[in-house]
Amino acid sequence: APPAMMQMWTMRDISDRYAPNSTDAPPYHVFDEMSTMGYSSNVAVSYDINFHRDLHISERVKHYTTIVKISDKKLTALGEGFFVTEHVEYLTGDEKPFADALITYFQYQAAEEKAEENTHRHSKQMEAGSPLLKGLSNAQTDYTDIEISALHVGDRLPKVVIPITHRLIVGGALATQDFTPVHHNAGIAQAAGMPDIFMNILTTSGLAARYVGDWAGANSRLEKLQFDLRAPNLPGDVMVMTGEVVALTLEPSADLVTVAFTGENSLGMHISGSATLALSGKK
C-alpha cells in the first residue's frame, strides 16, 4: 500500500461510513458547527505526515483524530474563516501505529464578490513559452535505485511536467475517497470562491510522493512528507515539479535523503514542502 495513500484507507466513504472503530463523532462536529455558523466551505492547506511502516495485505486499519488547534478568525483571498489543525493517529486492528499526521484545513465563508467573479472566470493553460517550461526535456526517469554515495547536498532532481486535467482532478478525488463536491462540481467550487473544480490535497500528496519516489527508485521508502498548498491546481493548467537534495543521513538501519520540492503552475506555487526517503541500500 503506497504510504501517500495512507489517509484514504480510513476516510468516510460515499455513504458517510467510517473505518470500523475509527473516530466517528467529535472532532468532526467542529466542522459541522462551523458550517451552521456560516463557514461552510473547506479546503485542506497543509500536511505533515510520518510513515512508520508499510501496510500489508489483510491488515485492517483505523484512525483516532483530535483537534489540536483552531486559529483566530482570519481573512484570506478565499474569504473569512478559521484554520483548524487535527492530529491523526493511524493504527492497525492490534493498536500498532503505522503513521501519524498533522493536517490543517481552512473552514471559511467564501467572499461574495470572489464567488461572483469566479462564475465568469476560466483557468488559463500554461503557454509553451512559459519560463516554467523552458529547459525541460522529454527524458523519463529510469526508476533505478539511487545509492547515497552518489548523492550530494544541492543535487537537483529532474523537472517533471504534470498536465492538470479534469480527469486527473475528478479521478484523483474519487480514487482517494474524497467526495467533496468542489472537486467535481464547477458551480459548487465557484460558490466556494474558486474559479473551477480544483485538485484535492490527497491527489497532490500522491503526485509529490510519486515525484520523489520515482527519482529515488522503486525500492526506496517514503518516511516523512510535509507540504503546504497555495495556488490551486485547475483544469487546463500544468504543474512543473522541481526538487533539491537538502540533507543526507547515514543511520544503522537506513540511508536517508531529504528532498525539498515545489510544484508550480500558471497561477504560482501550488505546493512547497519536503520529503525524507530511506534508500534501498540497507534493509
Region roles according to the model:
Residues D196, T203-L248, E264:
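Catalytic-pocket segment enriched in acidic/His residues
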Residues A1-S46, E112-R221:
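Hot-dog-fold acyl-thioester-processing enzymes
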Residues M5-M6, D48, L102, G171, ...:
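Generic structural signal for residues positioned in beta-strands
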Residues A44-P158, N233-K283:
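HotDog/MaoC-like acyl-thioester-processing domains
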